[in-house]
Structures are given as C-alpha cells and as structure tokens.
C-alpha cells in the first residue's frame, strides 16, 4: 500500500481522523510504501503548518524532515524511487484527473505522482481527503 503525504501529515499533525488512519496502517496486510515525492510533500506541508505567516525557516524544514523520516521508519515503510514509468503515469493522471484540466478530482503535482506510483506498483493508495475518490483508484 502506498502511503500518501496527506496521511503522514494528518497523523503527525493529529488532524481529525488521524486515529482511523493509524489503524488502517497497522492493519495493512501488504507492505507499506512511500516515495521521495511523498516524503517531500509531507515535509513541506508540515513545515508550513508550523511557520508563522512568513515562510518556514530551514530549522522548521529540518524538524519536519526528522518527523517524517521517523514516521516512515516507525511504520516500516519502504521507499521506492520514481521511475520513468511513474513519470509517464503522472502525466496521464494529470491529463485525466488534474487541476490543469479542471477534473473534479483536482489532483495537484504531488497527487499525480502518488496516483502514478500506486498504479505503476500495482498497490492500493491510502490517502486522506476526497481527491483520489474521484479517480479509478477509489
């Protein structure tokens, strides 16, 4: 199962619904997977949450990275690289479900790569929110 950045952020920020996401991770009967882009998106999002109205400081980014890395280790997730196939599928995801084409799923850059990674690896995608519910991964 590919773990989307939205799940990592929700759990580390203790957003509403985070306990259910923790339970789903614990109950997963397949290996958990992240990508460098998932980690990047989670780090940036967490650092932004902790910042003042100004942009996050390098220290906040490093703290967020440590938190994300620790969570990935705690859930024993494997990190897989972004391949050419994933890149191709991300473009396809953007074409079919992206913000750029006005699709209701409204997938952004990170979402398109999470979608593509799950597709390329043939695994399910654990996410928070409604965006992926409007794709064929739902």
Language-model features and meaning:
Residues 1, 32, 125:
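Residues that recognize and position ribonucleotide moieties
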Residues 1-19:
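Metal-dependent nucleic-acid phosphoesterase active-site entry motif
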Residues 4, 34, 107-108, 129:
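Histidine- and aromatic-rich ligand-binding microenvironments
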Residues 8-9, 39, 132-133:
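A generic structural signal for short hydrophobic patches within well-formed alpha-helices
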Residues 13, 47, 119:
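Short, locally clustered residues in the helix-turn-helix/winged-helix DNA-binding domain
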Residues 22-33, 37-106, 112, 116, ...:
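PIN-domain endoribonuclease scaffold, especially VapC-family toxins
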Residues 117-125:
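C-terminal structural segments of small proteins and small subunits
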Residues 126-134:
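Gly/Pro- and small hydrophobic-enriched strand-loop and loop-to-helix capping segments
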